[in-house]
Amino acid sequence: MMYIVELVRESLKKKTFNKKIFLELCKKLDIPIPQKLNKHNFPPLFYELIDKLKSLNIIEFCEITMDLHTITEKQKEILLNMVEHPINILIIGKGGGKDFMVSLLFNYMMFRACVEDYYEKFTRIDFVNVAPNDHLAKNVFFKEFKAWFLKCKVWQMIGIDKKKRQKAPICVLETKAEIGDKITMHSGHSRATSFEGMNALCVVADEISDPDFKNAEQLFEQGLSSAKSRFKDKARVVAITWTRFPTPNPRDDVGYRLYLDYKAVDEAYTFKGKTWEVNTRVSKEDFKAQYQKNPILARCMYECEPPELNAYFISLEALEARHKVEMGLFTWRAIYENNLIRLEFKQLQSTDKTIYCHTDLAINRDKGVIAISYFDKGKVIISDIIVLTPTLGHKIDYLSLEKFYNHLQNHFSVKFTFDRFQSEYFIQKFKGERLSKHVKLWTTFQELVEGTKEYYDATGVKRKKAKIEIRCNEDIWQKLRTQILQHQIDGDKVIYFGEGSPDLADAVVSSAYNCITHNVNAIDEEDYSYRQVFDDEEEFEEFEFGSFF
């Protein structure tokens, strides 16, 4: 028995069945309506309606049940292919109607799950949309889905309860919609979604290229495996996004990499299109201001095309070589309690070098980042990167930061710098300096990364090229690397082409700059012993350690 029969029986019993909508659908589908509806002629009329609705493709279904006649030709093409193919990788410019199309797909697939015999054997069927973060899950995607779900006359006919379940078989909650006890549509985010215990028929990875999407490719493959193992070729798994292109290698954009990898897969539909190619109600001219303000980001956002190589001011290969997963001076964690984020730390090792602590402060927006560095044997060592991430309910506890700074003063020779926001108290208390973002910081960092930064001994003799070593875990490194690469030098300006605030990059670059500028005349003890052996600088420059043996 079709599940929709159970739903209608329940709605008739609880008197939530909408006779007016039922007759309206019959009329739209040219089904003859008797003068008087009764218990004898209703069942055959109902089954005829369901048969006709089942025969509709997704475009016809939306036109009949939602009075939707504004789907563009390219959107129609994409929707028809999404229904046809088990795997869909869609790279579409921002404003192209991604959430709109996914919402229509969910509605259509949920209807199919209610009326096709294949699904009778399943006691539960799940539809899952995974967004990068909670805000996008609740306030962007689900808001769009909910609007079209409530407009669908099939669901209206059965009866919908809003906010909480009362009498109707269908209920729409804050981040999910329930059709009876069997079918549920979930809108979750990448940090909280698991397919364990789900019978996922349709999975959508929404904005999979967003750097905030945790374990994006892994989550997509898990969703694909989960859906295919249960529903085989009936499963529908979608990755849909506009591109970010965080590095010079286009394959470092997760969505774009999936698009390339699945192009040769027979059961996959892959598509890449500019905003105005998909949503023909807009043109490139409509985004003129965005192109003038940030042309590189606009090209990624609306055209889904990678930036030119010269858009990246720093060598990716050199930057990757500077990362080390090694123990820092501290171990730390963020404690979320009493509406505050408290920094908890423990010192693991020490150094007799002066350390340079830069803090990019925050309270309840962006991240609070502390970067610590010191100079040793010709290298700027970024030894520690501490990240505190506020939430809607938690602000950074500045008293815990003060405790940390006091510890640094008591156990190290330390110099403090801070960005210009929220920093006046700390600058005064710890005799710190304000360090604002400017070109010199970033060109110096580039020289350190690429090994072209020179430093000198105390007599002014050129020593060698200084380099940088960045010690942090893989999770912090991926975010830091992306933020660094999304900067560009334009004359006397530093431009950030990424989304949000580049707190990690700003803190690390500032700490490194402070460290090297205080050590341009550094001379290491190890180097000094060699310097005494060779008085001639040219001979010293060409000296190889192997000549000792």
From Swiss-Prot:
Organism whose genome encodes this protein: Methanocaldococcus jannaschii (strain ATCC 43067 / DSM 2661 / JAL-1 / JCM 10045 / NBRC 100440) (Methanococcus jannaschii)
Designated name of the protein: Uncharacterized protein MJ0330
InterPro entries: P-loop_NTPase
